[in-house]
């Protein structure tokens, strides 16, 4: 009898893990689409960043945002 209870527990655990992984992938895809849509709306003034003219702030901002988004996607935020 104990073997069947363990089997049922493992079976239900596998189903719940598979369901959680599927929901997680859908959510991460949605978030990455939102990040892509919102990137162009962010300006240095909006974020409170004041860049010296020698930094070429626009290019710097884009590099920082690309790195940030890549890190967030890797860690599946």
Swiss-Prot record:
Say which domain of life the source belongs to: Eukaryota
GO CC: one term?
extracellular region
The tissues where this chain's protein is expressed are given as: Expressed by the venom gland.
Q: Got any disulfides in this one, which pairs?
A: 51-57
| Keyword terms | Antibiotic, Antimicrobial, Cytolysis, Disulfide bond, Hemolysis, Membrane, Secreted, Signal, Target cell membrane, Target membrane, Toxin
Q: What does the function comment of this entry state? A: Disrupts cell membranes through the formation of pores. Has antibacterial activity against Gram-positive bacteria S.aureus (MIC=10 uM) and B.subtilis (MIC=0.5 uM) as well as Gram-negative bacteria P.fluorescens (MIC=1 uM) and E.coli (MIC=0.5 uM). Has hemolytic activity against human erythrocytes (EC(50)=7 uM).
What is the protein's given name? Oxyopinin-4a
Native species: Oxyopes takobius (Lynx spider)
Lineage per the UniProt record = Eukaryota, Metazoa, Ecdysozoa, Arthropoda, Chelicerata
């Amino acid at each position: 009898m104990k073997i069947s209870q363990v089997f049922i527990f493992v079976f239900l655990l596998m189903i719940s893990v598979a369901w959680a992984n599927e929901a997680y992938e859908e959510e991460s895809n949605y978030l990455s689409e939102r990040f892509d849509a919102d990137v162009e709306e962010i300006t240095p003034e909006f974020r409170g960043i004041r860049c010296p003219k020698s930094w070429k702030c626009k290019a710097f901002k884009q590099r920082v945002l690309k790195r940030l988004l890549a890190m967030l996607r890797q860690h599946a935020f």
